[in-house]
Regions:
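Re-entrant/interfacial helical elements at transmembrane boundaries that shape
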Residues: 102-104, 138-151, 179-190, 388-401, ...
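Core transmembrane alpha-helical segments of multi-pass membrane transporters/permeases
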Residues: 53-100, 285-351
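Alpha-helical transmembrane segments of multi-pass membrane proteins
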Residues: 116-130, 155-175, 197-206, 366-380, ...
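Short helix-coil transition sites and intra-membrane helix breaks within transmembrane domains
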Residues: 26, 76-80, 90-101, 131-143, ...
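Membrane-interfacial loop-to-helix junctions in multi-pass transporters
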Residues: 3-7, 73-80, 108-122, 155-161, ...
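N-terminal alpha-helical transmembrane segments of multi-pass membrane transport
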Residues: 1-87, 91-110, 114-117, 219-244, ...
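Long, contiguous bundles of hydrophobic transmembrane helices that form the permeation core
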Residues: 3-14, 18, 31-38, 42, ...
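Hydrophobic alpha-helical transmembrane segments of multi-pass integral membrane proteins
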Residues: 82-85, 112-147, 335-337, 360-400, ...
Length: 471
């Protein structure tokens, strides 16, 4: 294929997708459409569709559509199914009130802390812990605004300080239940150097050793930045804010003790299984799918005991399957991104990039690729407010580009994935910033001013640590 046509087509497609991301438009259909167009261009130019072991339908006109079907099948058999299960389990936890109880129980200890600025790092770390239960940044912010915000105000914390801390709670807590972690782990496992890699191994072996120190650094940065910014703020009583109590929070101690563990039970099972295997006591691999299914069965049993009715408990399980359906857009985005990448591979762009990047590591420039992708993530996130859209779109490309640059795919995957989640709280158009600023009656830019330094400090520290560990 002519180089001018190849690069021109690729640049135009990237520009269209970038425009749609910035405009916060749904890019799934665009990725599908552009991917198919690129495959047709490749076929006209005499290239083949770049899918391993792809068998043509016998009609070139149908092959790009067959590629979509093939990609859907392979994704649903792997990462897609895990994401659907996680969506179902999260929805079921909300339905039976377990999420509400977990938030209530974990929030209680902070009521005894009276210093507003000591509360800043405590609430930040607590909020990130709660993101294991409620991974959506906007949903977690809504819950914390209703439950923790009044407590923080009564402790003397200003609205902007409290809002900034709440806006930054769902960031980079390492969890095998994160759909972004599931997607990249399954993609890496397709390559020989990461053969057999599970989500737990990726999260605890790579993600956590960067994300946990980064969270601690951000907690410290939060303390000093909020204290610096709040030096001229008046302490105002929060009598106007009413605390809302969850409808499930007045039940027995036994009930609360059991339900508080249910939302994080899959994580507990995966952590236990991971360390048992690490210590050599077992060779059993507990997958995310099995952990979720076991947890779901236990949750149904607990709910039937609480309701004194198996019939009523089983009726509520319908929410699990509806939750799976609600998670389908994430799977569709992953498939759409893969189809687009197949299109880029088919026109020869990926091979051309590999040739350009070969030798980069030998010249001591191995950090350039991760840096470019982190900067690109920053631009897209700041303009669009989406922390993971670009990452999902890039997942199929990460191993290939890293190999071409002569560096580990982990050195690309970890910083790019973490950067998007961190910088979400710095975008004035992100859902979480809009929700928080509206709730505390402040301008989004004022909230972003309070979140920016801790998040940027986290990105810089995270990138440097990733390069030291993985490059």
């Amino acid at each position: 294929m002519n180089s001018f046509v190849m690069y021109g087509t690729a640049i135009l497609s990237i520009a269209i997708i970038g425009y749609m991301l910035v405009k916060k438009m749904d890019i799934k259909i665009t990725l599908f459409f552009i991917g198919v167009i690129l495959m047709y261009i490749a076929i006209v130019a005499g290239n083949t569709i770049a899918i391993k072991d792809f068998k043509s339908s016998g009609a070139g006109l149908l092959d790009p559509l067959l590629a979509i079907v093939s990609t859907f099948k392979s994704t649903l058999a792997g990462a897609g199914f895990i994401i659907l299960l996680l969506g179902g389990y999260a929805a079921y936890m909300s339905e039976i009130g377990a999420n509400e109880i977990t938030v209530s129980v974990l929030s209680k200890p902070i009521k005894n802390i009276r210093s507003p600025y000591v509360l800043v790092p405590v609430v930040f770390l607590l909020g990130n812990l709660l993101s294991l239960v409620i991974p959506s940044a906007s949903n977690l912010a809504i819950i914390l605004l209703a439950t923790l915000y009044p407590v923080l105000r009564k402790a003397g914390m200003s609205p902007l300080t409290a809002g900034a801390v709440i806006a930054t709670t769902a960031t980079i807590m390492p969890t095998p239940l994160g759909s972004d972690n599931v997607a990249i782990a399954n993609e890496l496992a397709k390559y020989p150097e990461f053969a057999g890699l599970t989500v737990s191994q990726y999260v605890f072996g790579y993600h956590a050793i960067v994300s946990i120190p980064t969270l601690l650094i951000m907690a410290i940065a939060h303390y000093f930045w909020q204290k610096f910014e709040g030096r001229n703020e008046a302490i105002i009583s929060a009598n106007e804010v009413e605390k809302t109590e969850g409808s499930y929070c007045s039940n027995s101690v036994l009930y609360r003790s059991a339900y508080v563990l249910l939302p994080i039970l899959p994580i507990i099972l995966l952590v236990i299984a991971y360390f048992i295997k690490l210590l050599g006591y077992s060779k059993v691999d507990l997958t995310v799918e099995i952990a979720v299914v076991i947890s779901f069965i236990i949750a149904v049993l607990c709910d039937s005991i609480k309701r004194h009715s198996l019939k009523e408990a089983v009726k509520e399980t319908e929410k699990f399957f509806k939750g799976m359906g609600n998670a389908m857009p994430i799977v569709a985005l992953l498939v759409a991104a893969t189809v687009y990448v197949v299109g880029l591979k088919s026109i020869g762009l990926i091979s051309a990039l590999q040739n350009v990047m070969t030798g980069m590591n030998g010249n001591g420039l191995g950090f350039v690729l991760p840096l470019i992708l982190v900067v690109l993530s920053a631009v897209i996130v700041l303009l669009s407010g989406s922390g993971t859209a670009l990452f999902f779109a890039m997942v199929p490309l990460i191993p290939t580009l890293a190999s071409a640059a002569g560096i580990s795919a982990i050195a690309v995957a970890v910083p790019m994935g973490l950067a998007g989640n961190l910088l979400r709280a710095v975008s004035p158009v992100s859902a979480v910033i809009i929700i928080v600023s509206g709730s505390i009656k402040a301008d989004p830019i004022e909230v972003v001013k309070r979140t920016s330094i801790p998040m940027i400090a986290g990105v810089v520290f995270m990138f440097i640590l990733s390069m030291i560990l993985f490059l």
